[in-house]
């Protein structure tokens, strides 16, 4: 197959789309990626990529369009989204006209898949979307608008138009199918199929890991630092826990609440208890997992977005560690089945209780949780299984 992949992010941005493209090349397919110049988490274009419009990396042909870098402000993020939308739509007009199928991955915002829609429509080929985020649901959950407002209704109309133009939708969480049926009104049940997103593949020396002070219980959170991840309640819970146990919490990542996190650490005098490490590549983040007592997962149990299976969950399970999870929805169901987590609700009290419950576990119980998570990952989320499903979907919709 000759495959066109459209995604705003690609290597060195830390997203699993890179894993997918390189897998398809290894399986003998001709793969071209249309993406933006990398800037995620850097507040600028990554050095060396400023003038790099085309490259071939591990067999993948990559076209990079100019984007306005994200700088942390809401306006810069909007400009970043719109610059990719505009420049990528222009670029697809200049691409070869002989691709067999288009594959896109929908992260926020969903307009980033518009170039894929444009190419597929122009050349009358099928478009397969891998949906990792729901619109306009995400806009509501992040507090930008509310259900029923004029802005929401306009976004809903736009979303329906875009989603209905797609030939096949792979959803990263089972509950997303309910959203497409009841909210987006896609009645043909054969259009949607549950296919998790692959775990980001990284190279790491298993003997290269961070040494913790064993006088403390050491926990790690790795991921987006935002409202959806329930960061404010986590901070309040840690503040309470410092009076109950010797605890250190290591946080890796970036997000809208990064500055809020830093301010609260200072305000509550938690410098010895919350260590913010900033953004790190997945390969480096793993170094903090090995000797940690457990990994923390938080996701606000609100709306359909709150029912998702975050990619960090499968990343955690792959690393064979116990998990403390403040979640609901599909992710909660996964962890109930794996029997590898202490699960709680989103409240401060619930989070505190979960950490106290974990503290009382003996070492064999923790080791069993770790093993359970890894075995569940191998059975349900192993990349070879998921990537093969993606390839099969593309073959089915190839002209």
Regions found by a protein language model. Give the residues of each.
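Nucleotide-activated donor-binding/catalytic signature segment of Leloir-type glycosyltransferases, i.e.
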Residues: 216, 252, 259-287
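Nucleotide-sugar-dependent
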Residues: 229, 283-288, 295-317, 324-334
């Amino acid at each position: 197959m000759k495959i066109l992949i459209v995604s705003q992010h690609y290597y060195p941005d830390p997203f699993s789309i890179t894993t997918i493209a390189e897998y398809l090349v290894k399986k003998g397919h001709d793969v071209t990626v249309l993406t933006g110049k990398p800037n995620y988490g850097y507040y600028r274009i990554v050095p060396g990529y400023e003038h790099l419009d085309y490259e071939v990396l591990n067999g993948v042909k990559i076209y990079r369009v100019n984007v306005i870098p994200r700088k942390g402000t809401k306006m810069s993020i909007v400009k970043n989204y719109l610059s990719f939308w505009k420049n990528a739509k222009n670029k697809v007009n200049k691409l070869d006209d002989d691709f067999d199928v288009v594959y896109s991955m929908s992260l926020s915002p969903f307009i980033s898949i518009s170039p894929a829609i444009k190419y597929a429509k122009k050349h009358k080929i099928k478009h397969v979307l891998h949906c990792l985020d729901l619109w306009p649901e995400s806009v509501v959950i992040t507090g930008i608008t509310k259900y029923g407002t004029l802005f929401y209704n306009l976004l809903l109309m736009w979303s329906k138009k875009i989603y209905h133009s797609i030939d096949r939708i792979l959803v990263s969480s089972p509950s997303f199918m309910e959203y497409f049926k009841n909210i987006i009104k896609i009645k043909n049940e054969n259009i949607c199929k549950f296919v998790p997103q692959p775990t980001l593949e990284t190279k790491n020396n298993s003997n290269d890991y961070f040494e913790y002070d064993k006088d403390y219980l050491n926990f790690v959170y790795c991921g987006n630092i935002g409202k959806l991840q329930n960061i404010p309640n986590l901070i309040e819970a840690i503040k309470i826990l410092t009076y109950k146990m010797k605890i250190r919490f290591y946080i890796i990542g970036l997000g809208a609440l990064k500055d809020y996190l830093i301010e609260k650490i200072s305000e509550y005098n938690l410098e010895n208890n919350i260590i913010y490490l900033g953004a790190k590549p997945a390969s480096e983040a793993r170094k903090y997992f090995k000797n940690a007592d457990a990994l923390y997962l938080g996701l606000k149990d609100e709306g359909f977005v709150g029912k998702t299976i975050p990619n960090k969950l499968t990343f955690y399970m792959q690393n064979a560690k116990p998990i403390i999870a403040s979640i609901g929805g599909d992710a909660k169901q996964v962890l109930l089945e794996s029997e590898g987590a202490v699960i709680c609700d989103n409240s401060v009290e619930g989070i505190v209780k979960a950490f106290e419950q974990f503290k009382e576990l003996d070492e064999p119980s923790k080791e069993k949780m770790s093993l359970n998570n890894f075995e569940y990952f191998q059975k349900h989320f192993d990349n070879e299984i998921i990537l093969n499903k993606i390839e099969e979907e593309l073959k089915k919709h190839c002209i």
